[in-house]
Structures are given as C-alpha cells and as structure tokens.
Amino acid sequence: MAISSSTSGTSSSFPSRTTVMLLLFFFAASVGITDAQVGVCYGMQGNNLPPVSEVIALYKKSNITRMRIYDPNRAVLEALRGSNIELILGVPNSDLQSLTNPSNAKSWVQKNVRGFWSSVLFRYIAVGNEISPVNRGTAWLAQFVLPAMRNIHDAIRSAGLQDQIKVSTAIDLTLVGNSYPPSAGAFRDDVRSYLDPIIGFLSSIRSPLLANIYPYFTYAYNPRDISLPYALFTSPSVVVWDGQRGYKNLFDATLDALYSALERASGGSLEVVVSESGWPSAGAFAATFDNGRTYLSNLIQHVKGGTPKRPNRAIETYLFAMFDENKKQPEVEKHFGLFFPNKWQKYNLNFSAEKNWDISTEHNATILFLKSDM
C-alpha cells in the first residue's frame, strides 16, 4: 500500500523517514519485544543466606526480573511488593493433600495470592514439584496433584485472576521413558495414567507445563556416550541428526523429546516453561567452576532462539539457583548457586537486561544475558 508524503505536496509511493521509523517501531513491538526470558530460582535451604530484603535488592540490582520460590514464604512475598519481579509461586509437596479440599485451596489462595496481588506480580502457581508415581519418595502424593491443581485454579478463577495467573505443576524428565531420537520422545507407560489427565487439564486452561531440565545430570550419568561439549552448548557441529533436524546441544534434544512426548499424550499445544536448569560448580563429576560458567552463559543466550522442533520461539527459563545452599543433600546439590551466600557472584559474571531490536527475527525479546568479564 502506498503511503503519501506531504514533503513535496504531491503523492509519492515512498514513505517519509518519520513514517518508516514509526513503522519499524510498531513492527518491532508486534513481533515480541517482551520482558527478559530468563529468571532465577530462589532456594532457601541454607543457614548462611542473606536476609530476604537483601536478596530482593540483589535481584533488582542484577536486573533479574523473574523469580521462582518453592513455598509461600511471607517474608519473601512482603519484600517482593512493588519490585516488578514476576514470580512462580510454589505449592509445597507437603500441602498437596490438604489442597484437595476446595475450601482449603480457597483459603490458600486468599492468604498467599489475593493478599499480595497486585503489588506482587504472580506469573504461575506451581502445584507440586517433581512428583512421580514411580518414585518411592513421592508416589503417594501423585493422587493429590491434579485435584489440588483444579482447586487452586478454581480459587484463582473465583478471584478473577485466571488470565493473569496460570496454574501448573513442575515435572522432571524421569517421566520421559524414551528421549532418543528427540522425535521419538514418549512418556513412560507407567506414568501415563498420572500425567495424561494433568496434560489434558493444562490444555483446557491454556497453561504451560513446567519442566526441570538438567543436561548436567544426563551427561554425568552417561559421559561415555554423551560428550561434554554437547552438554555445554560448545559443540562446533551437529552431534545428533533426527531426520532433517540437527542437534548441537543436549538441552535442545531434551526439550524437543519432551515436546514429542506431549504430542503423543495429546498435549501438542502446550508450551513448556523450563522451571529449573543449572550446572554445579563442585561436589561431583564434571561439576566445576568453568563448566558452570560455560553452561549458564550459553544457556541464557541460547533460549532466546528456540529449538530445532520449535524454532524462533523464546524459551522461558529459570536458572537454578540464586545461592549455594549448604543444607541440601547430596553434596553436589549444595553448589548450584550463581552467587555465594555473601552475595558475591560465583562466576564473576555480569547480569544485564537489554532490548533486542533486531527486527530480522521473529523472536525479538528483552534478553537477560550473562557476560564474563574475567
């Protein structure tokens, strides 16, 4: 369509410079300039962690605009008021049975969500973390997850917040029985009766599935068949071909296997939020400072671009975790922090948030990146 220019008083087929700039601005906005895609999980299993107020200040100082917490800690919620930090709020596994009672779920939402909205920006409610019907430690809780999810969602809807706050649950990848090649990804047969109804519910309310994805553990359990560069995003060439799709890193292969598993469970429309991912700096095989820094910095740059199966779609991702936590077990679990408890950056990395105005791509977003200044 021709745009008239008034500079000469006659019609022209060429737009003015001002018009072009305006069009570029609105086009850039239309293709997805959004908040940073990367957040950081705030675990609190340490006896030497900074006061909550200092932690929130550190998030803000570091331009980390999204957070995940694992229970409705009152001090954290109070400190988040007015911070503009978007939050994944966890429902502890220990609360699941109680929340199968609709009245209890309504009270939980009233106390922990309504009481803080909208000065706290709740993004998701994660109802349970890594529940598995085939894990002896959590199997007895599996029966409570979906009823609790339904009741929390109903309470959120009764509050009129269903469009602002989505309800989900966080899984780990042990529920995926086959992951190679990624297109053959499928959930274990013995978890389908648990997981399929959850997938159906998430699809019906248009909520994403939360998934904790750790290439570190996959590599550490099988270093003979998986190369370290493939796990760290440093492979210079394709490692795995899956039809026409080439995989240069384990993260993409893992996530695409999950997408394939969801398709086989009638959940192909679901988005996946990577609710945890990280690499330890000590405590076990391949857990080193250099590997941690390499993985995290590459992950943050990588997730703005999607996977081979779902390209050009930023992947909302939460790094695990903000601090080393000295009360966790086993030893390796103590060393996932991006910061030491004294608030020093473990990797001497510089967090920054900036707009990406490259309109040549379809996935423009505000990118939170890690840049080493070592």
From Swiss-Prot:
Residues that bear Pyrrolidone carboxylic acid: Q37
Residues annotated as signal peptide:
1-36
Q: Where in the cell is it found?
A: Vacuole
Q: Which UniProt keywords apply?
A: Allergen, Glycoprotein, Glycosidase, Hydrolase, Plant defense, Pyrrolidone carboxylic acid, Signal, Vacuole
List GO BP terms, alphabetically.
carbohydrate metabolic process; defense response
Name the Gene Ontology molecular function terms of this record.
Answer: glucan endo-1,3-beta-D-glucosidase activity
Q: Which residues are tagged as glycosylated in the record?
A: N63, N350, N364
UniProt-listed Enzyme Commission number(s)? 3.2.1.39
User: Where, by tissue, is this protein expressed?
Assistant: Expressed at highest levels in laticifer cells of the petiole.
Instruction: List the PROSITE patterns.
Output: GLYCOSYL_HYDROL_F17 (PS00587)
The chemistry this enzyme catalyses reads: Hydrolysis of (1->3)-beta-D-glucosidic linkages in (1->3)-beta-D-glucans
Similarity comment text for this entry: Belongs to the glycosyl hydrolase 17 family.
Subunit structure, briefly?
Monomer.
Protein name, per record: Glucan endo-1,3-beta-glucosidase, basic vacuolar isoform
What organism does this protein naturally occur in? Hevea brasiliensis (Para rubber tree)
The gene for this chain is HGN1
